[in-house]
């Protein structure tokens, strides 16, 4: 497997980081510190960094300030959200779940949802990225009753 790196950008000028290889170790403490030190965190209500990206899957570390909201959206893939710090509220059209440190939520594709930070929060978003047109079990809002 070819190793893939993310090149430095104006957002993250301190060099490249490993994005994909046969095995990738991810230092969440280091990435959490990094996103809290970046200009985006200081000047907006959120910041995020992709810590792994390969065909079919992406892992993103997301930081939200208290009361920051990711407005209603859908994702064409399965997702999991795992809270590292803080507390978030995830709301679909029919259900809500408050998650704290050590708690997770899994959500099927194309379910409209939003995320609200009840406290300053850090969480991992893992998502599949190749479901479009695939024959997977389809769920929609009515299945969430």
Predicted feature locations:
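A short, N-terminal "cap"/entry segment at the start of jelly-roll beta-barrel domains
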Residues: 1-56, 140-145
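Double-stranded beta-helix
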Residues: 3, 26, 118-145
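Conserved short histidine dyad/triad with adjacent acidic residue
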Residues: 43-45, 58-75
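A cytosolic small-molecule/anion-sensing beta-strand core signal
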Residues: 55, 84-85, 100-101, 119
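Glycine- and acidic-residue-biased ligand/ion/polar-headgroup-sensing regions
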Residues: 66, 76-89, 93
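Short beta-strand His + acidic residue motifs that chelate non-heme Fe in jelly-roll/DSBH
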Residues: 70-72, 90-91, 107, 112-118
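Short acidic-glycine-tyrosine-enriched beta hairpin
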Residues: 93-109
């Amino acid at each position: 497997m070819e190793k893939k790196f993310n090149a430095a950008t104006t957002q993250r000028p301190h060099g490249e980081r490993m994005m994909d290889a046969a095995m990738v170790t991810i230092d969440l403490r280091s990435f959490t510190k990094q996103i809290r030190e970046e200009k985006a965190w200081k000047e907006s209500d959120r910041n995020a960094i992709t810590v792994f990206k390969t065909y079919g899957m992406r892992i993103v570390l997301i930081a939200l300030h208290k009361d920051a909201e990711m407005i209603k959206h859908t994702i064409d893939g399965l997702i999991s959200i795992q809270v590292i710090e803080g507390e978030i509220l995830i709301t679909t059209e029919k259900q809500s779940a408050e998650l704290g440190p050590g708690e997770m939520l899994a959500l099927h594709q194309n379910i409209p949802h939003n995320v609200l930070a009840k406290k300053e929060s850090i969480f991992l978003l893992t998502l599949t990225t190749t479901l479009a047109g695939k024959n997977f079990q389809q769920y929609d809002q009515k299945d969430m009753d």
